[in-house]
Amino acid sequence: TGAGKHFSSGADLTDGGGGPADPRLVMRRRSARIGERATLAVHEMDQITIAAWNGAAMGGGAVLATAMDFRIGADDCFMQYPEIDIGVNLMWKGLPLLLHLAGPARTKRLVAGGERAHANTLLEWGVIDDLVPRAELMDTAREWATRYAAKSPIAAQMIKQSVNALAGSMDRAVMHMDVDQNILSATTEDRAEAIRAYLAKAEPSFKGN
């Protein structure tokens, strides 16, 4: 879970987009893969993982939540992918992780449409596995953790690995270029316009360039 009001509110965009200090493409590609490696480390670890999700899961924070095995949502939880509104695609292997939970149309609504989905919708869509009052979130997450910790660890690990392999058999083949797509989209005029509009609290005017 996150500290404070939110699970993870995502990147700080007030720096104009950020990026590595070294401008060489080879270093930008290396830097951009850090989040992907963190996502896969969570998704592929042997242990069962449970997100205790309060407040926002935005962008990379939403990717982290979907990388876990289960998500317990507080009644104030919500999800949003703001990447589309800042002129870039979603990376960190986040697209297939969401697709497996919510399905194609809902994934498009969230990622291409930038919609915000709140607790009851997330439960209905299968993104979260349980919905509880905020005050009961951590106790419920601990109950789930205790339940799975009592299971045979070897069998549980093999089941988790097999389910992940079956569900995501095409994920890497399709999404292996999402980092490069993000780097490309970050160089566009539309990306610069999106950041300008975000900082100015104005509506962007995209040109498709």
Predicted features, each with a name:
Residues 2-40, 87, 170:
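Glycine- (often His-adjacent) and acidic-residue-rich active-site loop
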